[in-house]
From Swiss-Prot:
This is Glucans biosynthesis protein G. The lineage of its organism: Bacteria, Pseudomonadati, Pseudomonadota, Gammaproteobacteria, Alteromonadales. The gene is opgG. Involved in the biosynthesis of osmoregulated periplasmic glucans (OPGs). Its main location: periplasm. Residues 38-60 are annotated as: Disordered. Pathway: Glycan metabolism; osmoregulated periplasmic glucan (OPG) biosynthesis. It comes from Shewanella sp. (strain ANA-3).
Amino acid sequence: MVSLLRCQSFKPSSSLICSLALSAAFALSSSAFAEETKPAENKPATPVVSPPKATAQPANKNQVRFTKTGTFDGDSVVKLARKLASKPYVVLKDPLPAGLAKLTYDEYRDIRFNPISSIWRDQGLPFQMQMFHRGFYFQDLIEIAIVEANQATHLAYEPKYFTAGEVITQALPNDDIGYSGFRIHNQLNTNGVYDELMVFQGASYFRALGKGNSYGLSARGLALKTADPEGEEFPIFRAFWVERPSYDSNLIVVHALLDSPSVAGAYRFSVRPGDNTQIDVEATLFPRVELSKVGLAPSTSMFLHSLNGRHDTDDFRPEVHDSDGLLMFNGRGEHLWRPLANPRQLQVSAFSDNSPQGFGLIQRERNYASYQDLEAHYERRPSLWIEPVGNWGQGAVVLTEIPTESEIHDNIVSFWKPRQPIPAGSEYHFAYRMSWGEEPVAKTNSVVVSRTASGRADIAKATPRRLFVVDYHLNGAMPDELPLAKVESSGGVISNVVIARNAANNGYRLAFELEPEDKELIELRAELKFSTPRQVETWLYRWTL
C-alpha cells in the first residue's frame, strides 16, 4: 500500500506510487460507455527528452537566491522561472544545524511561531502572516519576501520570531536558515480574531479554509507522473513573494516560484476569504522536458470508508473521509457525480472532456451523525471546486484512488490532464478559480445525489449480487410525476430497478441490483429522466471485487 502521509501540512517528496500494477482506466460519459483504456505505459509513442542530469549545489552557507531585495512587478517571477528553466535542474543544498535536521515530530511541534511577531500585526491590516520553522521532515529552505509599492524585501530568518518549549534543549540558530513555509491569518470567523486562512508548506502543497471549516483536503501547484510505476515527481515552491494587503481590501496576493527536474513555473494566487474562500490562480509553466504525464489544478484528499464501501472496516464511526465524491460539470452540459472509494487495488479513472466547466473533490455529507468523531469533525472539512478560466481544450479529469487502511494517509488525487503533451522549451499558461468551503458550488433548481449505499442483495444468504441505493435531493419544488430511471453497466446484469419518492430527503430513492457474473470491474451509470427539462446529476460508480 502506498499513499501520501498526512502529518500537519507535511507531504513527503518520496514517490507516491512506486511499482503497483495499474487497473484499467474506464469512465462512463454521455449516453455511451467510454472505451476501456490502460494507463500510459512507460514507453511513449514518440521519443521524449530526459530531464537534464541534476547538479548538486555545494553545501555551504545559506544564501538568498530568489527573493533578493529590489524592484518587483507582476512579471518578475515569470522572468525568474523562464531563466531557471533554461538551465539544468539544480539540487539545492541548504544544510541545517545537525540538531534541527534530526528533530523528532514532538520536538519540531514544540517550535512555534510567536503570534506577537506576526507580520503586519501592529498595522491593523485585514491579514497577518506567520512562518514555519525548518526541521523534521521540512528540510527544504523556502525563501519569502514582502512586496510593498513595487519593492520586494527579503524576509530573513529571526530566532526571536519563534518560541521553543521544554522539549527543545538547544538554542535556535542566529544565521538566516530560511523557513519551511508560512500561513496567512484573517478575521475569517470572528471580528478581532485572526484565524488561519491558508497554509503553504511542503513541496507545492497548500490548503485553505472557508468560514467555519477545519483543514481537510489539500491542493498542489502541479502534479507530475501521478500513479506512474517509475514514481511520482513532486515539484516544490522554492520562493514566495507576498504582497502587503490594503487596509480596506479583502484580498491578499501571493506569488510563487515552482521548480522540479522537469519544469519551472510562475504562480500568482489572489486570495479572497469568505464563506467560500476564493483563490484565483494564474500559472505559467516552462518545461525542461516534454510533459506527457502532467496534472493541472491537482487536489489531494482522504477517503477511508462510508456507507457505499466499508470493506469490513472495524470502526465505530459510520464514515471517515475528507471528501466523499468527485463532481464534474463537463463541456457537454452534464453534471456528473462519482462517489469515492477505498479500493483493494489501485484504481485510475479518466473522464474525457472538451472545455470542462468545473470539477472538484466535494465533502457533501455535512451531518455530524454520519461521522460521530468528536475530534476530527469531518463534517467541517471544506470542499474544493475548480473552475477553469478560458478554454482548457481536450483532455480528461483524472481520479486516482489508492488503497489505505488508515485515515492518516491521503489516498485520493484528482486533476485535469491535457490531451496533448506540453512541449519542452514552451511557455504554457493556464488559469483557474478555486472555491474552498462548505457549499462551493452554487445551488440551482437541480437534482443532486445526496447519498450512495451498497450491500449484499440477499440478507438471508450469501450472494455475489449487490444492492445499490442512490438517494437524490431536489433543490426546489418536487414535480407531480416520478422520473424515469435508466441504469447501465459495462458488464454483469442489472435488475430490479425501482424509483420512489423520498419525502425525508425532498427527493427520490433509486434502487437496483447488480449481478457481477465473472467480472472483476464494472462501470455503472444511472440517470433520472424528467418530462420537463431539469438539471439532474448523472451518477457514476466503479464496482470492483
